């Protein structure tokens, strides 16, 4: 995977290397160089200066950052509108790294499994088509499920899992909320309240945009718009149903691609700059304090 390192993985690699290097210096100096130095010169650790002292002081900080970022919480920024209205461009979220397992920070191999994604979870994962980037979508289908998306309506036939009577397919419940203030390409969007598993959340649909059946991923042996989720994979969709490149188009998300579970928004910025403004477009021009909190 090193030939396809995304920005988050590259940072993890650099952070890991820096931690290993400064840690090696820390322990070499503490248990070998320092005793020899004090014996020969009488210079104590507190009086020591230079690059060795700097490396020793950096190690605890880098080690703490590595542990927190690799195994506890990692920050991510939402760059697009595919998860509107749940997540907006400019939201900065916290992702639980331990929700689905503890992974090594470089090769992303599972060290200790801790759980499985549940229907309705919002997950960050490595793009199956482009390992250089991470995606964020909502888990709709679990291994063994049959997912049907037809006429912009979602149906789920849960996996049988050895039951004597297998569950029947059902339409995922939703209620119309109204026309949203969010617009895509100048078109107002319909907003619905959807009940997916134990999660109640909002979705958007564009009433003027037809379904792109010709672009859907067609699973061998299944009709267009119908998918059977393989073992060890998941079916993920964006809440902005007509503006999301997701499992409907590229297929299934492998379990090993999971990065973590999105759980909260810790800050949210706006970047709505006037075209004539001299303010750099990459700098925020406002803060949405009402966005801070848990994600559903």
Language-model segments: residues:
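Transmembrane helix-loop junctions in multipass membrane proteins, especially transporters and channels
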Residues: 33-38, 74, 78
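Soluble "head" domains of membrane/secretory-pathway proteins
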Residues: 2-37, 46-47, 51, 85-296
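Juxtamembrane inter-helical linkers in multi-pass membrane proteins
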Residues: 40-42
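Transmembrane alpha-helices and immediately adjacent membrane-cytoplasm interface residues
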Residues: 49-77, 98, 102
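Acidic/histidine-enriched ion/cofactor-binding microenvironments in catalytic or ligand-binding pockets
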Residues: 81
């Amino acid at each position: 995977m090193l030939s396809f390192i995304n920005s988050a993985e590259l940072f993890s690699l650099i952070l890991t290397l820096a931690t290993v290097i400064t840690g090696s210096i820390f322990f070499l100096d503490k248990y070998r160089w320092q005793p020899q130095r004090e014996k020969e010169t009488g210079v104590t650790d507190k009086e020591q200066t230079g690059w060795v002292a700097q490396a020793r002081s950096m190690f605890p900080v880098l080690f703490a950052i590595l542990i927190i970022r690799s195994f506890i919480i990692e920050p991510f920024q939402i760059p697009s509108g595919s998860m509107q209205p749940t997540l907006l461009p400019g939201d900065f979220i916290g992702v639980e790294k331990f929700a689905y397992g503890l992974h090594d920070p470089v090769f992303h191999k599972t060290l200790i499994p801790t759980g499985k994604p549940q229907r309705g979870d919002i997950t960050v994962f490595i793009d199956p088509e482009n390992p250089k980037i991470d995606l964020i979508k909502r888990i709709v289908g679990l291994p063994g499920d049959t997912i049907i998306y037809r006429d912009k309506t979602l149906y789920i036939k849960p996996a049988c899992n050895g039951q004597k009577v297998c569950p029947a397919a059902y339409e995922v419940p939703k209620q119309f909320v109204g026309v949203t203030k969010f617009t895509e390409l100048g078109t107002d969007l319909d907003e619905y309240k959807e009940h997916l598993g134990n999660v109640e959340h909002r979705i958007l649909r564009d009433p003027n945009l037809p379904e792109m059946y010709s672009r859907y991923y067609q699973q061998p042996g299944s009709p267009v718009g119908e998918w059977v989720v393989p073992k060890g994979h998941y079916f993920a969709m964006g809440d902005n149903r007509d503006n999301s490149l997701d499992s409907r188009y590229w297929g299934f998300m492998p379990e090993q691609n999971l990065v973590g579970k999105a759980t909260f928004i810790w800050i949210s910025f706006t970047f709505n700059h006037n075209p004539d403004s001299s303010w750099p477009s990459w700098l925020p021009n406002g803060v949405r304090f009402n966005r801070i909190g848990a994600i559903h």
